[in-house]
């Protein structure tokens, strides 16, 4: 029996969440996480890593399936979005982060987690603020 494309896409999406969540739960905060530059994230696929850079864009996709917020983390010296890591905060975890599309935009930070591959790009799911560490602390005004 063949599944129609929307059903197959939903099944693949669900499987990705389960696999990535399992990987995150096992390894995301391991002492063995390597530290890499966003431009090297593609080579880090399948590994747990800490990726440090600047959030070049932060977009909340309200109304889309899972209501994700996409953070594009780039190397500040080479801000090429094609060589960036996409960090994803899904809607069910969003409240833990406040309004990440405003508080994280332009921030110099590190994200730690399992790097997966999605639509030709490296991606990391963020489920808790413990996966974030600021290189330069945000001001009180930015946190409001």
Region spans (language model):
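OB-fold and OB-like single-stranded nucleic-acid-recognition modules
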Residues: 32-144
């Amino acid at each position: 029996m063949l599944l129609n494309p929307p059903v197959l896409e939903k099944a693949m999406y669900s499987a990705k969440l389960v696999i990535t969540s399992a990987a995150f739960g096992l390894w995301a905060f391991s002492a063995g996480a390597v530290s890499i530059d966003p431009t090297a994230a593609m080579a880090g696929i399948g590994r747990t890593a800490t990726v440090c850079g600047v959030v070049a864009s932060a977009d909340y996709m309200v109304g889309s399936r899972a209501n994700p917020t996409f953070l594009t983390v780039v190397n500040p010296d080479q801000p090429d979005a094609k060589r960036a890591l996409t960090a994803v905060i899904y809607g069910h975890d969003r409240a833990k982060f406040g309004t990440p599309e405003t508080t994280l935009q332009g921030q110099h930070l590190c994200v730690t987690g399992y790097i997966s591959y999605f639509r030709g790009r490296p991606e990391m799911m963020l489920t808790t603020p413990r996966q974030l560490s600021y290189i330069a602390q945000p001001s009180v005004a930015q946190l409001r």
